[in-house]
A protein has these predicted regions:
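Conserved ATP-binding/catalytic motifs of P-loop helicase motor domains
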Residues: 1-486
Length: 486
C-alpha cells in the first residue's frame, strides 16, 4: 500500500485552492458529501488515476513542473501517461515559440493527447484552442442589454470626459464589450464606475482577474465588489451571476479562455485590458480577437496629473503621437545602477536575471540578519509562490527577525529559514515581467538590446513620479512579434 505523499506548504495550498468541493463535483463528477470533503485526499485519488492531468490543472504546473513533482513525491506513472503529457507540452511550446495558434510538421503520435489536426495533415493545434475560438465566435456581436446609465450617480470628472463617458456606456449597454487603455488613461477608474452602474441596474456582478496580484491591484481601486481570480471562479463557482467583468484580459491564454467557456452561461461580458502590455504566459492571444469582433472603447487621453513626461515617453516608445513640448522634468539618465539608487530608485527593472541579481546585491541591507542569513531586517522582498498567506508578486518588507508586512495591513510570519528563502526573493531588482501590475513612485529602468517595445513600455510606465534610465536606450527596441490566429 502506497503511503500518501507529504506535500510542501505551497503545493498543499495550490491543491486546496484548485480542488475545491465545487470543482471536483462539477468537473470530475465525484460524489462526496461536503462535510466529509478533503481536498488533499481527493487530489491523491485523482492523481492515482491520472497523475499528469491532475497536477497540470494546478496553478503554474506545466509538464516540466509536473514531472519534477511526480519524481519528488515518488508518485508512480506509466510511460504512456508521460508520452501524452510530453506531446502536449512539445506542441504547445512550438506554438508559443512561433507565436501561432498552430504547430506545423510535428512527427509524434498525437492520439489521446489533446492535440488535434487542422485540415492539413501536418498542421496541429490544441482542443482548447478550438474551444476558445468557437466560444468567442458564438458570442453575440451587437446584442444590447436593458441596462441604462444612472447619470446622477456618475462622478463629475467622468461626465466631463466624453471619452470616458462613452466607454462607460459601451460596457454597460452592450452584452459583450471591451475597454482598452494604456497607463494613466483612467482605465481602473472607469472600470470601477462600470461595476457601480451595473450594480445600480440591480445586476449581480462577478469581477475577475487572471492573477492574485492583478486581483489585489484592482480590488484597491473599486468602490464596490469583490475581485476573484479566474482560476478560483472556474473551479469553485457557486451561485448565479448576471455580468462577468474580466480585468487584465490581455493576460488571457487560450487555455484560460477555454476554462471560462466551460462555465459560461450567457452572462454579460466586459473585457478590460491594455493592448500594449506583455502577452500572457501560455499559448494563444484571444483578447486580440475579442477587440476586433466586439464593441470596443479605447481610452487615449492621459489623466495622470503628475509626471506626464513619463506617460509621453511610454507612448513614444510604442510609436504613438504625443505632445513633444512636454518638459521632461521627471526623467533622469544615469550610467550605473548605483547612481539610480542614490537618486531614490525604489526598484530597478530589467529584462535579465543577471541585472536583477546585481541590483539586489547592491541594495540589500547588510545589517541585522533575519531568520535566514541571506535576508536582513529592513529588506524589501517579493513573494514567488502563492499560499493562503501571500500571493506571487506580493511585495513585503522584513520588519522583525521573522516577520514581514506589505504596508496594507497584511503580515506574514516565517517559522523556518527555508520558509522565507523558498517563498521570497529580494525585491530591489525585478524582471520587467514580474513588475507588470505594480507601480512605484521612483523607478529605475535598465534597458537591454533584448527588450521589445512592449517590455520597454511596461518598464517605463511603472513609474508614477520619477523615472531613472540606466545606461541609455538601445538604437531601437524590437517589435513584439504578431500572433497568428487560427
Amino acid at each position: 500500500m502506497q503511503v500518501a505523499p507529504q506535500y510542501s506548504e505551497a503545493l498543499t495550498n495550490n491543491i486546496e485552492r484548485t480542488y475545491t468541493y465545487a470543482h471536483v463535483k462539477n468537473v470530475h463528477g465525484l460524489e462526496v458529501e461536503p462535510h466529509n470533503y478533503d481536498a488533499i485526499e481527493t487530489f491523491n485519488q485523482l492523481v492515482a488515476r491520472d497523475p499528469f492531468g491532475t497536477f497540470m490543472q494546478l496553478d503554474s504546473y506545466g509538464f516540466k513542473n509536473t514531472l519534477r513533482a511526480l519524481i519528488r513525491y515518488d508518485i508512480p506513472y506509466t510511460a504512456e501517461q508521460e508520452r501524452k503529457a510530453r506531446v502536449y507540452y512539445e506542441v504547445t511550446q512550438d506554438m508559443e515559440r512561433n507565436r501561432s495558434d498552430v504547430s506545423i510538421g510535428y512527427q509524434g503520435d498525437i492520439a489521446g493527447t489533446g492535440i488535434v489536426k487542422v485540415d492539413d495533415p501536418h498542421i496541429y493545434t490544441t482542443e482548447t484552442t478550438i474551444k476558445s475560438k468557437r466560444f468567442i465566435e458564438t458570442l453575440p456581436r451587437n446584442k444590447k442589454t436593458f441596462n441604462h446609465i444612472h447619470v446622477d450617480k456618475v462622478p463629475k470628472p467622468l461626465l466631463d470626459s466624453a471619452e470616458q463617458f462613452e466607454a462607460l456606456k459601451n460596457s454597460v449597454e452592450n452584452h459583450v464589450s471591451c475597454l482598452i487603455g494604456g497607463a494613466g488613461t483612467g482605465k481602473s477608474f472607469v472600470t470601477s464606475e462600470i461595476v457601480e452602474q451595473l450594480m445600480l441596474n440591480e445586476k449581480h456582478v462577478t469581477i475577475l482577474a487572471p492573477t492574485h496580484k492583478s486581483k489585489s491591484a484592482l480590488q484597491q481601486k473599486l468602490k464596490r465588489g469583490t475581485v476573484s481570480t479566474i482560476h478560483s471562479y472556474v473551479y469553485g463557482r457557486s451561485g448565479e451571476t448576471d455580468v462577468i467583468v474580466i480585468d487584465e484580459a490581455g493576460m488571457l491564454s487560450s487555455e484560460l479562455m477555454a476554462k471560462l467557456a466551460s462555465v459560461y452561461n450567457g452572462e454579460q461580458l466586459v473585457f478590460v485590458g491594455d493592448k500594449n502590455q506583455l502577452p500572457p504566459i501560455g499559448y494563444g492571444r484571444p483578447f486580440e480577437v475579442i477587440q476586433e469582433l466586439f464593441p470596443t472603447a479605447e481610452l487615449k487621453a492621459n489623466r495622470r496629473s503628475e509626471a506626464k513626461d513619463i506617460i509621453a515617453l511610454g507612448r513614444e516608445i510604442l510609436g504613438q503621437p504625443f505632445n513633444a513640448n512636454i518638459a521632461q522634468n521627471n526623467i533622469y539618465l544615469v550610467d550605473t545602477a548605483e547612481e539610480a539608487f542614490k537618486l531614490g530608485a525604489e526598484v530597478l527593472l530589467t529584462f535579465t536575471r543577471d541585472g536583477v541579481k546585481k541590483a539586489n546585491e547592491i541594495q540589500r541591507i547588510k545589517g541585522e540578519p533575519s531568520i535566514h542569513k541571506d535576508f536582513s531586517i529592513g529588506d524589501k522582498i517579493i513573494a514567488k509562490t502563492n499560499t493562503k498567506r501571500f500571493f506571487n508578486g506580493q511585495l513585503f518588507k522584513i520588519v522583525t527577525w521573522n516577520k514581514a508586512t506589505d504596508g496594507q495591513g497584511n503580515a506574514v510570519t516565517f517559522r523556518t529559514p527555508y520558509e522565507l528563502s523558498n517563498n521570497f526573493d529580494l525585491a530591489y531588482g525585478l524582471t520587467i515581467h514580474k513588475s507588470q501590475g505594480s507601480e512605484w513612485d521612483v523607478v529605475a529602468y535598465q534597458p537591454s538590446d533584448k527588450d521589445t517595445k512592449n517590455l520597454a513600455y511596461v518598464a517605463v510606465t511603472r513609474a508614477k513620479q520619477k523615472l531613472i534610465i540606466v545606461g541609455g536606450f538601445p538604437p531601437q527596441f524590437k517589435e513584439e512579434r504578431d500572433w497568428t490566429h487560427l
